Amino acid sequence: LQALVAEGLLAPERLGEFLSDSGTPTYTPELGDAILSYLARSRARLMLVQLEDVVGESEQANLPGTTDEHPNWRRRLSLNLGEIIYGTRLSKVAELVTEGRLQAARR
């Protein structure tokens, strides 16, 4: 969270909104956008975004070491393909990543 504040992606006075009693940040779409922007601004040559992050899935997609307890490779997304393609979220993520990558290129 401090890195997001340092990059100007999260206001310092809002840090408390994202902290839980367990010390693990509470995920919100706003926090997710800040994280995507932060990653896109990195100097990494490759950046990938999981479709689960685009559609806002909160359950972990793959739990290593499980077989029958967790259907790792049979999970369905909560949105269908049309909702993903024609919804606003995919274009928002593409915009955040494009803007971040352009900033990274200028560094």
Where would I find each of the regions flagged by the language model?
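Catalytic cores of glycan-processing enzymes that make or break glycosidic bonds
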Residues: 1-107
